[in-house]
From Swiss-Prot:
Produces ATP from ADP in the presence of a proton gradient across the membrane. The catalytic sites are hosted primarily by the beta subunits. The gene is atpD. It is a peripheral membrane protein. Keywords: ATP synthesis, ATP-binding, Cell inner membrane, Cell membrane, CF(1), Hydrogen ion transport, Ion transport, Membrane, Nucleotide-binding, Translocase, Transport. GO terms for cellular component: plasma membrane; proton-transporting ATP synthase complex. This is ATP synthase subunit beta. One of its GO terms (molecular function) is ATP binding. It comes from Herminiimonas arsenicoxydans. InterPro entries: AAA+_ATPase, ATP-synt_VA_C, ATP_synth_F1_bsu, ATPase_a/bsu_AS, ATPase_alpha/beta_chains, ATPase_F1/V1/A1_a/bsu_N, ATPase_F1/V1/A1_a/bsu_N_sf, ATPase_F1/V1/A1_a/bsu_nucl-bd.
Amino acid sequence: MADGKIVQCIGAVVDVEFPRNAMPKIYDALKMAGSELTLEVQQQLGDGIVRTIALGTSDGLRRGMIIQNTGNPITVPVGKATLGRIMDVLGNPIDECGPVSHERTASIHRKAPAYDELSPSQDLLETGIKVIDLVCPFAKGGKVGLFGGAGVGKTVNMMELINNIAKAHSGLSVFAGVGERTREGNDFYHEMADAKVVDLENPENSKVAMVYGQMNEPPGNRLRVALTGLTMAEAFRDEGKDVLFFVDNIYRFTLAGTEVSALLGRMPSAVGYQPTLAEEMGRLQERITSTKTGSITSIQAVYVPADDLTDPSPATTFAHLDSTVVLSRDIASLGIYPAVDPLDSTSRQLDPLVVGQDHYDTARAVQGTLQRYKELRDIIAILGMDELAPEDKLLVARARKMQRFLSQPFHVAEVFTGAPGKYVSLKDTINGFKMIASGELDHLPEQAFYMVGTIEEAIEKAKKLN
């Protein structure tokens, strides 16, 4: 392949000149002679010049430096060799456990599966978290988004889902850390090792592969690391496995695109995002899907800037998801964790034909009661509880019990709360809320329902309070 030379370097964007008859293709990987740095071609400007994004720091680059065209897109190791390992965007190991075997590699850019290869799923994925299982159940092979502003518990919820699903899950998991804190990546690795999901002695017996492009990395790495993780998940799916794919945080993927978009010469669109936002998001999300061979169940954390769900980035993500779990600052401020908003959160699975009539009726009864309580709160704030009709007073009492019963101690938060984590089966969840809605537990104080697992625990707690 022909060599080129750097003609311009602005931050993470580098222009390279090649002979006119040997211009690299879009998405080709370029290597710098005598260095680990990889560049990815984004645009062909004409006259032999291509505009690239550096997947690494561009410090020390200068005009005239020699760049080699590999002739291929970025490829990363896939298959069993990736299990138990921590890799970067290029598939290089960053866990100090030696090189990753390159028996099989795959390009991080590929087309989404054809329509006739797709396999829709109706099976439910039980999470053990009451509020999620009740009002926004997950589908096996579906896509789930955890939406929330800063500090309302996206990562803690994600870790609890990993704890409840990945540890009990017989298949494999891939975790992509996109632009998040390095500390969280480190904690996750050690937690997985303690739970034997990562086998430190025989990594190939592990059940999880980890790919990190943390917030201290250049934008090129953060832009591509989700694709690297997805490529590894697709390889397992194509072998006939059921894969869990966790992404924390999909917003940073968008943000990395925004950072380089202006440098690539594109006009910004709404709120300064890249004009190609919907296309980039679609290209990633359309690949996260289940085929007749195997399934990918994806759980993605989505940061919501300034708690504004109408911001273009979360709004674009909404369109691709089967279930949306919305975390609310108002609920967190009441001390109710997980701070999931049962009125804002939705799921395509919450349909009597999928979950069954009993589950559906219970979920709608809970949502109806909480919605009515929300409407009455203004009256209570102005006139007080005494001005309410007797039936409304009863409804408010039940709604407050439901609200508290939606809280639950988490396994991953045991060290902070001192309370042992609880996993609640779907059957127990439905039974508990049915009893509250029917009025069977009207005689119990509302404190008894706070931070417990099953309804039996709430009844026991009420006895102690008395």
